[in-house]
Amino acid sequence: MNKPDVAKVAGEYERILVEFFELSAGLAPRFDLILLGMGNDGHTASLFPGTEVLNERTRLVAAPWVEKLNGYRFTMTLPVLNNAATVVFLVCGEEKSGILKEVLEGPPDQYPAQAIKPATGQLTWLIDRAAASKLKS
């Protein structure tokens, strides 16, 4: 899919969200629950480190180019994710233990997963023992 096509598809997905949630201009939908995972690089949804989509504040849906994947990825943007009533991260496996420690105990604002901060909602991390193995507590 080329850039004009992905922009069109992202725009259509956004239009559907606006229509379904009966949104006024500039408002983000409020999902009851959003389930997220986290990649070994600290990405979540399709919000990857170093991509411009992390700075998006007006669009609800974007299709950023992800260099390491050599392709576009569709994602809801931070205004949508952070407007949810509840966001739950599911993180499993020893291979995630290092990045989980960095995300939860390291400096803030280093990884996309750290940008998930529901404005008026709840954030929950569900992690297994292997993923938690490097955490302090």
Annotate each PLM feature.
Residues 2-137:
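Conserved phosphate- and dinucleotide-binding cores of soluble alpha/beta proteins
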